Amino acid sequence: MEPAVVSADMETDGEQLCKAARNGDVAKAKSLIESGADVSFFDRDGLTPLMHAAKLGHTDAVKALLEAGAPWNALSPSNQSAGDFSMDAGHQEAFEVLLNAGIQAELILGTIARKTKKNGDSEGDYLEDRVTFSEDKLMDSDSKAVMMAWEKPLMEAHAKAVCSGGGNILNVGFGMGLVDTAIQQYSPATHTIVEAHPEVYERMLQTGWGKKDNVKIIFGRWQDVLSQLESYDGIFFDTYGEYYEDLREFHQHLPKLLKPGGIYSFFNGLCGGNAFFHVVYCHLVSLELENLGYSTQLIPLPVKDCLGEEVWRGVSQKYWQLDTYYLPVCQSIEGSE
């Protein structure tokens, strides 16, 4: 029996809009939109008109759909956005249009990585939570990983960056102590560590961190201990239970905390479950740091071989699912000239 042929008249406006997007037919797409077609429509494959246009590199159709309010951050059943489709297919022009749309939207709305503290999972919840230490991970009570041993090579690279000029080093967020152990290898003049979780702080003392000659431990949330901080030659920031807004807030204090010519870096786990969203946030944070007077170099580090399925056994949430980690190295624009 032959399958039934669906005529254009029988197709919904949404299906026709997907078809126009696939064909790159901008005039038809605009006509359908003006007639009330839903730009956020998902077809039977779970794809939006914008995804179809992006997948095939129809840049003008991508622009028209975005101008009509098509959601740039909608996800397919395979967890891919329109930007992912254009990126994977090598459609550079469409990709750049979507990237700019994502950056502009996040500058204004911040819908992906920014969350309000009222929605739970805030730093306050974490600081009151019990944590569990094991040889290869630090976990909260929901079996979410606070820090894991696979990050060790990344932390060593971060330490190398922030210690490149020697002097006085600040780390915000001790976790398993991976980055601080690496920092110690460079024998900094002083090594200040800010840690807010009481159990992590206790473990630091138990394992001798309070007895190291060049180490100063400050217990508390970084927001509450700013008056105890000085200025540093290298700074690393990696807190758990905070959001992008907290990182942005910390960046506002860099002009006071980072000495001229100093190096700043942070754990770049922004949107670590989606490649395109991660690119958007790498660009966004670089742009916002530039507005504060800092240049950002993103150094690609392959991590695929570190992340077999066994790494995530017993962990409820894979906070990193990408093949490459982009390590940020930030320096004042004046100091790097």
Regions found by a protein language model. Name each.
Residues 28, 60-61, 93-94:
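Conserved ankyrin/ankyrin-like repeat signature
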Residues 245-331:
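C-terminal substrate-binding/active-site "lid" region of AdoMet-derived donor-dependent transferases
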